[in-house]
């Protein structure tokens, strides 16, 4: 569905046009699940696992809000830190998503348009087929684009297209020098931005 949506729109989502979340998550849940239940007389409480420290926009969200039409949003972990989430996993003997021990700061889409430089490098090192898939998608979406080009990440001084961004992800000092230290490290070893390997 994601590739089809991008081809239909002739572009990839961006931080200002996050149609991926809107059309592939929010709208599907509303129209296929929540509205039919409301039509049957049910009230909906939508439990959402968003945390305030994930972004400035999420920090502004209330813990609970009634959005009308019989729907209330409830964000029980809004004030939690990432560490609080992992502590709750461990308290109940639930293993976190294994991607968190492979250098990923977020899981869901791979890569997410919000992934950072280190995460992009980790994806390229551990999952090179994902990078090839994105390159293929860029060609497909680019063919449908009015501009004749489409990239998952914004094209700027870092480069144009996933392959150039992966090369940039291997650099330090403003993208001018390759960071050689990771080349000496075991890429299959545990790596966590949340300290899960200690």
Regions found by a protein language model. Name each.
Residues 1-198:
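Nucleotide-activated chemistry modules centered on ATP-dependent adenylation/adenylyltransferase
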